[in-house]
Amino acid sequence: MKKPHFIFILCLALCVACSKTETDPECVAMRALVNRVVPEYSKNIVLERLETDSVDRFELESKGKKLIIRGNNANSMAVGLNHYLKYYCLAQYSWFKEEALELPAVMPKVPEKVSLTARVPERFFLNYCTFGYTMPWWNWEQWEHFIDWMALNGINLPLAITGQEAVWYEVWSEMGLTDEEIRSYFTGPAHLPWHRMQNIDRWGGPLPVSWLENQKELQKQIVARERELNMKPVLPGFAGHVPPCITRIYPDAPLASLGDWAGFDSTCWCKFLDPECELYAEIQKKFITKEIEMFGTDHIYGIDIFNEMIPPSWEPEYLGRVSRQVYESLAAADPDARWLEMTWLFWNERQYWEVDNRIEAYITSFPKERHLLLDYYCERQPVWERTNAYYGVPYIWCYLGNFGGNSMLAGNLDTVNVRIERAFEKGGDNFVGIGSTLEGFDCNPLMYEYVFEKAWDNPLTNDVPAWVEHLADQRAGKEDVEMRAAWKLLADSVYNKVSSPGQTVRINQRPTMGDIQEYHQYYIAPTYRYNNIDLLDALDHLLAADCNTRTRHFDVVNITRQLLGNYFSDLYADYVKAYREADYEKLHQVEKTMTSILDDVDPMLATESAFLVGRWIRDARAIGTTEEDKDYFESNARNIITTWGEEDALLNEYASRAWAGLTETYYAYRWKEFFKDVDAAIEAGVPFDEKAYHERICKYEGQWWRDRLSNFNAEPQGDGLALARNIADKYRRELEERYRK
């Protein structure tokens, strides 16, 4: 064969092979993701399908000007792309859509071939609560960005519970309930997760018909895209929660009241249908059948029948019988069904579950391969270690990390590393996955990215300091000594302690001079376990960094607001002490500084899109099709992040946020009214009347969300770097005096 002819045939063969690879459905899905995420690089990226499905893996290799990404499916290829972005482009694709990906002008080469393999087959993400604290107002554009983020981070088992009320509406209608009975049974949109988990009914309802249709169509888009990217959406199943008026149709239905939850009155209490009755299986089949018609299925369903609730009986035999009946009803509707269940209940009500073999009886009463458990809070309380690794039932190690979407710098990189590795070492063959069950997106995205990198055999994740150094480079877009110094400080302080419920600074707390239990501040945890001077030093390094990335701006704003928030929390203790000791000169001095902080925090937050209450409200209103609906959605959006129900509710402040607009018109307003009343009492020589203040401020809190007080910017305003420099200079002397040791 002549040489030119041979070369021609070889090139033709390569072109045919490349063409076949690019037409593979997995490569087609990945090509679409590449075009969305890195369109400027797309023409120089070649995708190839690896012919193995036994384990997820990817390869990266540069050939000339081309980057070759190989993977056994689109999800693995997406992880490969993200690895390239992080470790060669020094760039981060953020879960915050507004934080744009910043890429080098010249596409970097991969000097040596990279090959990584998934250590676990299942990578789970989300929490029922996330759909209330973060996602209730999302449109398709936001979901599309987030699904790409999930794919890039290797998530292949996402919770997918959007739009289920549309399914239930049809089921209940066919069973004879009226439109009013059904829609008034649902809660308001942001509170739906707790309705779905059998915690509350009715509050904030009835749901508009437009909401049901909007969410149904949105869910179709969500699950279609997730499946394109090799994910298995976890759809909801029937847990036994029924409208109380179902007894109008079925007067003999065996219903139990699940009773009080978080102080909501009896009109909001949920009714639970006994899984042992025939009606339970009938409803399960109706729901699953209709859900599959609407959204398709990957045969995995989330069902939690006793979340934060007490079962009708604690007898092990009853618990085993009930769980078996639930599974059998699911299998009757879908013979290939797997039941996914969170195990938060085993920790939250551990005083009941951890006796008489109740957990074992409950989770082992049907085939283990048909059950999948989420070990919900492993960074703090890994239940697998308390239950003989769940007695052989498959489970996923999960990092929770956040409660209520609170804005508190917090994390525990070293502990997460150690505990994940312990699960690999001692967790048994039924340890099948790594995931995260965060309640809301927060200001610590690095923790979740780290957790999902641990699902792959990247040796760098075992060296936390080295991983953090690479993270700093990604935040800077290059190697920067100042950025590295900042993140080393943060990793050694902020990101070295476990999170806890309700973490927030005192700014976000309703002011009180007395017992926080008396004035419903149960979920406020303003304590921090590091020296606040570390934040000032980290801020100085960030401001000195030689880069101008969006990620650096976010870090500067994030750290500055936490620095001031911690200082405010410490000053609050000084203020209360001065009042009790009648040291009014000291009190007024402290009050002046606290007021100054309140005035400085909001403009700082306003410079960063991730910290704007205006975005939250804008997105809520955008779903409405009438002014009435827009106002309804806005009020509901305001409520969940403030009183979480009626005024002075038990969950008040549980979902507090460090957001511009909210800080000025809600948090700062309360503090300034508090200072005014205390000052007036001192001037008059009488005790501060906290009860009167409390009643007045609770009324204002209700007005803030019901009457939709004030309008807010939905776009960032101002120069965060300049404001941070001014703040550092303004408070430096007193911060140094207080914290430098």
List each language-model region with its residue ranges.
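Contiguous, structured surface segment used for ligand recognition
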Residues: S19-V120
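Catalytic-core regions of glycoside hydrolase
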Residues: S42, Q92, E98-M107, L126-T130, ...
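Active-site-adjacent substrate/metal-binding segments within catalytic domains
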Residues: V120-N139, M150
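C-terminal substrate/ligand-recognition segments
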Residues: A525-A545, V557-R580
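C-terminal motif of bacterial Sec signal peptides marking the signal peptidase cleavage site
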Residues: C15-A17
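Second-shell loop/turn segments in exported
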Residues: K66-G71, G132-P136, V209, W314
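Extended, compositionally biased alpha-helical segments that mediate assembly or anchoring
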Residues: W659-K741
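Sec-dependent signal peptide recognition
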Residues: K2-I9
